[in-house]
Amino acid sequence: MSSGGLLLLLGLLTLCAELTPVSSKDRPKFCNVPPEPGRCNANVRAFYYNPRLRKCIEFTYGGCGGNANNFKSRGECKRTCAE
């Protein structure tokens, strides 16, 4: 296979992996914990995964502490936790 063909195959596999939803059995356990704003007062826009609604929701993060169900973008939250 030519290098162009290999590059195309690699690109298609990468795209497929990005578009494949995360199943609940593969979802990290921290995606199921409620959001924790932390103990500081920085008022940072963040996102957490809500397993009941099965989507990522915006919340205000204090900037320190908290838990792992805390993402800088909705996209990062979806890639990690959403089905």
UniProtKB/Swiss-Prot annotation:
Acetylation is among the record's keywords: no
Gene Ontology CC: one annotated term: extracellular space
Cited InterPro entries: Kunitz_BPTI, Kunitz_BPTI_sf, Prtase_inh_Kunz-CS, TFPI/VKTCI-like
Annotated site (Reactive bond for chymotrypsin): N41, A42
Signal peptide as annotated in the record: 1-24
A GO term, aspect molecular function: serine-type endopeptidase inhibitor activity
Domain of life assignment: Eukaryota
UniProt feature coiled coil, ranges: none
SUPFAM superfamilies per the UniProt record, alphabetical: BPTI-like
Residue ranges of domain BPTI/Kunitz inhibitor in the record: 31-81
Keywords carried by this UniProt record: Disulfide bond, Protease inhibitor, Secreted, Serine protease inhibitor, Signal
Cystine crosslinks: C31-C81, C40-C64, C56-C77
Localization in the cell: Secreted
Entry keyword annotation includes Disulfide bond: yes
Summary of the tissues where the protein is detected: Expressed by the venom gland.
Similarity annotation: Belongs to the venom Kunitz-type family.
Role of this protein: Serine protease inhibitor.
Protein name stated in the entry: Kunitz-type serine protease inhibitor A
Organism from which the protein derives: Bungarus candidus (Malayan krait)
Classification of source organism: Eukaryota, Metazoa, Chordata, Craniata, Vertebrata
